[in-house]
Amino acid sequence: MASQLVLRKADFFATPTQPVVVADRYPQNVFAEHTHEFCELVLVWRGNGLHVLNDRPYRITCGDLFYIRAEDRHSYQSVNDLVLHNIIYCPERLQLNVNWRDLLENPRGVNGDPRWRLSSQGMVQARQVIDQLEHESPKQDALSHCLAESLFLQLAITLRRHRYQPSGGTGPGEGETLDLLMAALGNSLDVPFDLQHFCSHYQIAERPLRQLFRQQTGMTISQYLRQLRICQAQYLLRHSSLLISEIAARCGFEDSNYFSVVFTRETGVTPRVWRQQWGALAG
């Protein structure tokens, strides 16, 4: 078995005291599973890809936010024009007297879901701070380190203020069209989603919404929802003893045979083979 790839501090931080660094991924390519000697925030700007975090797959796209601990294992697969920022930091180097743990701990939502979403307003504010942080963090003098840490604090507070978890039944509250749609899709893993009803409810034109969604994510709305459901099915196949028919129902598929066809088309193997590969309990 190959040894685990570990990303080292020395390869990313210019000095032993530098607290935070911005690593842009324009684009993020396929990247093998790895851990780190540091922690990171991952914020996705556009495109899509498969982010596998601690063996759980997530189809990620614009607005997705992850708090990654040093010991977390993750990789990027099946990327499509995926653009993101990694804000990497060393907790032991942070000097400001604030509750960093509360701001940066890996928070979990319903069912332990570590994925958060950032509202459109939050993305605009975060982008402005990250641009400043990217300019300041490479400087090696003490004042620059202090300013970089202050900007990092501002970013952490911005993320905390504007994040939400649609899978937990919450949404962005008052938000722009794409925020509302993402929240609705996140709450539709096991129930049908009616785009026409959604547009009527929020008085939104359907065609421009479809175009906006594809422009921002690189997918159609139905493709994205299908990917969310398949990722959920992969997780349940590995970590539960539910029958495959029960998993199909929990992932929005009324017909288990159709579920098997879609799952096989998306992953290359049948649900049963997927479960066997991971040594999960048989359905």
Curated annotation (Swiss-Prot):
Gene3D superfamilies: Homeodomain-like, Jelly Rolls. GO terms for biological process: positive regulation of DNA-templated transcription; rhamnose metabolic process. This is HTH-type transcriptional activator RhaR. The record marks E246 as: Interaction with sigma-70. PROSITE patterns: HTH_ARAC_FAMILY_1 (PS00041), HTH_ARAC_FAMILY_2 (PS01124). Binds DNA as a dimer. Activates expression of the rhaSR operon in response to L-rhamnose. The lineage of its organism: Bacteria, Pseudomonadati, Pseudomonadota, Gammaproteobacteria, Enterobacterales. Pfam families: AraC_binding, HTH_18. NCBIfam families: PRK13501.1, PRK13502.1. It comes from the Bacteria. The gene is rhaR. Residues 196-217, 244-267 bind DNA. SUPFAM superfamilies: Homeodomain-like, Regulatory protein AraC. It is found in: Cytoplasm. Disulfide bonds: none annotated.
